[in-house]
Regions:
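Anionic N-terminal interaction surfaces
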Residues: 1-22, 86, 93, 108-113
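Short, flexible active-site loop motifs that bind/organize anionic cofactors or intermediates
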Residues: 2, 31, 74
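Short polybasic amphipathic segments
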Residues: 3, 23-27, 59-63
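Glycine-centered tight beta-turn/hairpin loop motif at sheet-sheet or coil-to-beta transitions
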Residues: 7-9, 29-31, 67-71
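A generic structural signal for ordered secondary structure
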Residues: 11-13, 24, 41, 58, ...
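Phosphoinositide-binding peripheral membrane targeting modules
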Residues: 17-50
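Acidic, Ser/Thr- and proline-rich intrinsically disordered linker/docking segments
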Residues: 43-120
Length: 120
């Protein structure tokens, strides 16, 4: 599973349901756009001690398969982003009732970057 921590240059927003399509999360990172169907989000929690922009912050973490490749991804959205509050409000609006937004965990970085380097 890929992990992705949003950087300040990325944008994230919730697209409401429209023309038969379900609500989705849209992420612009660099020149790439990634979509996640909100109904397909498998898990959500608040992660503590995520390294973002050279600081430790909390981040909302969600796990879901992206719409294009249908590969499961773990996405971390730092809570100190200017667009975080609006994103969280919209995400909760369209999230399935089964998602538990009260869960919290400590972030454990990967020990391998999949390029032959091992950390920790």
């Amino acid at each position: 599973m890929n992990r992705y921590i949003l950087i300040p240059e990325d944008t994230i927003r919730v697209l409401p349901p429209e023309d038969g399509a379900e609500a989705a999360i849209e992420i612009f990172c660099s020149r790439t756009v990634i979509y996640f169907e909100i109904a397909q989000v498998r898990d959500v929690c608040l992660m503590h001690n995520v390294l973002s922009n050279r600081r430790r912050v909390d981040a909302l973490c969600f796990t879901a398969a992206d719409r294009l490749l249908e590969r499961e991804q773990m996405v971390l959205v730092p809570t100190d982003r200017a667009d975080y509050a609006a994103f969280l409000t919209d995400f909760r609006t369209y999230a399935p009732e089964t998602l538990d937004f009260s869960k919290e965990e400590d972030y454990i970085p990967e020990s391998c970057d999949h390029n032959g380097h091992h950390h920790g």
